[in-house]
Amino acid sequence: MVEADRPGKLFIGGLNLETDEKALEAEFGKYGRIVEVLLMKDRETNKSRGFAFVTFESPADAKAAARDMNGKSLDGKAIKVAQATKPAFESSRRGPPPPRSRGRPRFLRGTRGGGGGPRRSPSRGGPDDDGGYTADFDLRPSRAPMPMKRGPPPRRVGPPPKRAAPSGPARSSGGGMRGRALAVRGRDGYSGPPRREPLPPRRDPYLGPRDEGYSSRDGYSSRDYREPRGFAPSPGEYTHRDYGHSSVRDDCPLRGYSDRDGYGGRDRDYGDHLSRGSHREPFESYGELRGAAPGRGTPPSYGGGGRYEEYRGYSPDAYSGGRDSYSSSYGRSDRYSRGRHRVGRPDRGLSLSMERGCPPQRDSYSRSGCRVPRGGGRLGGRLERGGGRSRY
């Protein structure tokens, strides 16, 4: 670590305290031109400390002088002559400062960046300047990490809202299958919009799905919705075909349908969804089943006299954009139409209009499961007749 001082500078040690600069210059001037003679003196007493530095203009002269003069006696004392080296205190003064200067910026950078500095400085109660920095930077880092900590929870919370948003409709539907129906819809990609879209497409969607194999009685239910069977049934699957979404309402009697068809719960949930959206108008148009004359105007036709029956295998899904819960319900609706509450005398004349139209209002048959609807007896029978005459 000992560094040579500038070339041509010699260290002369072991001098007599009486020897001065002039004596040194006279002694070493024989080897070459001397640039500087520096006799080290005590600051307080101003007396020689016994060593000096002589700088030659030419490094070669310095080397010759060191070679010749080393160990010779000057003023009665043997002197030591060698290439001058940087003093230890000087090198230490210069050396350590760079690390210190480097270290301090590092410390400040740490405090600025991650707040590591602030943690250290309080523990040791560092200098004021460091403390000031830590005070300044402490706020920033302390704030920064907290947002980082807070950040992830929002992310975690975010997805649940997404899940919950779909659940909103399911919950409002009030079906026993809320979660399951929701999952079912999510799985098939049926969301809110399909509920409203169905009205126009109702005419042909039946053919498409029917051809695709959805018309099978259990096509939808058995295929996608087996899980829901265990749920509290809503008025069974006879809903769409014969009673026209009687399952659409939750108030529809749940009793006696689950045993006949495990799909009640499913229908109930989907019935609600559909009734709320695309099928409300059709149901209302048939609301007369409850008490008004059915002449309120036949609801939109779905493709002709028997088409509705043909597609009774379709759940309102067919109407509501392909929702899947009613296929089985329609497939089995015949049983209900024939076996359950036969109200009134089947009358073929009206069955056609009923077939053409959307199912009755949700209210009319939501209660029809329990009692014959007011003013709807004959109409119900006709509906049943229409169902009986269907291809199924």
Swiss-Prot record:
<dbReference type="GO" id="GO:0000398">
    <property type="term" value="P:mRNA splicing, via spliceosome"/>
</dbReference>
<feature type="compositionally biased region" description="Basic and acidic residues">
    <location>
        <begin position="381"/>
        <end position="392"/>
    </location>
</feature>
<dbReference type="GO" id="GO:0003729">
    <property type="term" value="F:mRNA binding"/>
</dbReference>
<dbReference type="Pfam" id="PF08081">
    <property type="entry name" value="RBM1CTR"/>
</dbReference>
<feature type="region of interest" description="Disordered">
    <location>
        <begin position="67"/>
        <end position="392"/>
    </location>
</feature>
<keyword id="KW-0687">Ribonucleoprotein</keyword>
<dbReference type="Pfam" id="PF00076">
    <property type="entry name" value="RRM_1"/>
</dbReference>
<feature type="compositionally biased region" description="Low complexity">
    <location>
        <begin position="319"/>
        <end position="331"/>
    </location>
</feature>
<dbReference type="GO" id="GO:0005634">
    <property type="term" value="C:nucleus"/>
</dbReference>
<dbReference type="InterPro" id="IPR050441">
    <property type="entry name" value="RBM"/>
</dbReference>
<feature type="compositionally biased region" description="Basic and acidic residues">
    <location>
        <begin position="238"/>
        <end position="283"/>
    </location>
</feature>
<dbReference type="InterPro" id="IPR003954">
    <property type="entry name" value="RRM_dom_euk"/>
</dbReference>
<dbReference type="InterPro" id="IPR012604">
    <property type="entry name" value="RBM1CTR"/>
</dbReference>
<feature type="compositionally biased region" description="Pro residues">
    <location>
        <begin position="150"/>
        <end position="163"/>
    </location>
</feature>
<keyword id="KW-0539">Nucleus</keyword>
<dbReference type="GO" id="GO:1990904">
    <property type="term" value="C:ribonucleoprotein complex"/>
</dbReference>
<feature type="compositionally biased region" description="Basic and acidic residues">
    <location>
        <begin position="67"/>
        <end position="78"/>
    </location>
</feature>
<keyword id="KW-0694">RNA-binding</keyword>
<feature type="domain" description="RRM">
    <location>
        <begin position="8"/>
        <end position="86"/>
    </location>
</feature>
<feature type="compositionally biased region" description="Basic and acidic residues">
    <location>
        <begin position="194"/>
        <end position="229"/>
    </location>
</feature>
<dbReference type="InterPro" id="IPR000504">
    <property type="entry name" value="RRM_dom"/>
</dbReference>
<dbReference type="InterPro" id="IPR035979">
    <property type="entry name" value="RBD_domain_sf"/>
</dbReference>
<dbReference type="InterPro" id="IPR012677">
    <property type="entry name" value="Nucleotide-bd_a/b_plait_sf"/>
</dbReference>
<dbReference type="GO" id="GO:0017069">
    <property type="term" value="F:snRNA binding"/>
</dbReference>
<protein>
    <recommendedName>
        <fullName>RNA-binding motif protein, X-linked-like-2</fullName>
    </recommendedName>
</protein>
